[in-house]
Amino acid sequence: MANFTPVNGSSGNQSVRLVTSSSHNRYETVEMVFIATVTGSLSLVTVVGNILVMLSIKVNRQLQTVNNYFLFSLACADLIIGAFSMNLYTVYIIKGYWPLGAVVCDLWLALDYVVSNASVMNLLIISFDRYFCVTKPLTYPARRTTKMAGLMIAAAWVLSFVLWAPAILFWQFVVGKRTVPDNQCFIQFLSNPAVTFGTAIAAFYLPVVIMTVLYIHISLASRSRVHKHRPEGPKEKKAKTLAFLKSPLMKQSVKKPPPGEAAREELRNGKLEEAPPPALPPPPRPVADKDTSNESSSGSATQNTKERPATELSTTEATTPAMPAPPLQPRALNPASRWSKIQIVTKQTGNECVTAIEIVPATPAGMRPAANVARKFASIARNQVRKKRQMAARERKVTRTIFAILLAFILTWTPYNVMVLVNTFCQSCIPDTVWSIGYWLCYVNSTINPACYALCNATFKKTFRHLLLCQYRNIGTAR
């Protein structure tokens, strides 16, 4: 009967308790085949998935954004875990002992810790980057360049290497001897459960708290920005229009304009040419004509106005000349002008007038430039609405992706780190199989991440499909 002895091993950023046996055979043949099949499949899916992520960002320009460069770095870490860490740990589980020697053991542990810590650092960078994007939208994007992203990614990897690699590789030389048996593989300075728990606090619990707080702020700020930039509906536009018409743009007393004022009204638009006066006065009429304006007066009015106490603003009165004259021709607009006439809509309230202004075509000849101007303004408005909608869609897409990544990280890493906490106070409370499952869950996080990108980002999903189906011509158009 095998004699199992619990020992300490490694798991990502912490240590895991492994078992060894005197007979060097922990599982039956069927069990070993099953374990190798499952773990080998997970390793293959992890490698393929993260290669797809890296290729997608490389070949699709729509995915070449600062945020996705951070995901590229995270995919590199996940790829290393899938290609090396998963398979080496599977060998350790199936064999029941470490068969590859001390040098390979230390190299594996150093690689495992550095890569796992780099993954956590990348998650922190993604969270902080998104937090500053939504809380400082005017100042931070100017500094958020590709160069800055590269420096942050390099800092994450260098810091992870400095923190773990020298200590793992050279601790035995610092203390003067190697205390890890040849048939086992674990970090020598983490053999104390209290030290292991301290590393778990620094490497998992603290980052999780920081990322959770940041995500809450990101979510609240994103909702606020999306609501603020939401396109106005018809009711809101109508309400604003009515408010504008009711606002006192111009208040004035109703007075009779001085002589010659009406003659100058035609030039107030600034784009109408003053036509020469007619050679002969208008034809005689037996009585005076009256042209009453109820609620509007035009900027091209040429008659004198006369004060009237009724609700109409003015009454236009024409005198009766003595000699006939040819019919007046309509005044021509300047061909170079792109403006139309200005109509002043006026309402009288007591002794004051409330006036609003709107642009209307003066003549058929002026309708075309006015229509061009209107079309340009309409096009600008449509572009602004489209940009606001695109921005809101990007906000939701990035926020969903970050949420999925953080959720996957917390769900897969929490079981093992809870066991680390329990093991600090009770080293015999957790079965060896449970330790192994918790350890593997940390690795499974690297398998889940590419699925999170595809589920939360349609562009990633389409690019994955084009790459898998070898539809390379469609990759550049995937959105």
UniProtKB/Swiss-Prot annotation:
Pfam families membership: 7tm_1
- Name the cystine pairs: 105-185
Q: Where is the composition biased (Polar residues)?
A: 294-304
Where is this gene product found?
Cell membrane; Postsynaptic cell membrane
Keyword hit for Translocase: no
Biased composition, class Pro residues, residue ranges: 275-286
- Residues modified to Phosphothreonine: 459, 463, 477
Q: Name one GO cellular component term.
A: plasma membrane
- Membrane topology listed for this record: Multi-pass membrane protein
> Which Gene3D superfamilies does this one have?
Rhodopsin 7-helix transmembrane proteins
| UniProt GO MF annotations | G protein-coupled acetylcholine receptor activity
Any stretches that span the bilayer, and where are they?
32-54, 69-89, 107-128, 149-171, 194-216, 402-422, 437-456
Q: Looking at the record, which segments are called Disordered?
A: 271-333
Identify the domain of life. Answer: Eukaryota
Q: Which UniProt keywords apply?
A: Cell membrane, Disulfide bond, G-protein coupled receptor, Glycoprotein, Membrane, Phosphoprotein, Postsynaptic cell membrane, Receptor, Synapse, Transducer, Transmembrane, Transmembrane helix
- State what this protein does: The muscarinic acetylcholine receptor mediates various cellular responses, including inhibition of adenylate cyclase, breakdown of phosphoinositides and modulation of potassium channels through the action of G proteins. Primary transducing effect is inhibition of adenylate cyclase.
Q: What is this protein called?
A: Muscarinic acetylcholine receptor M4
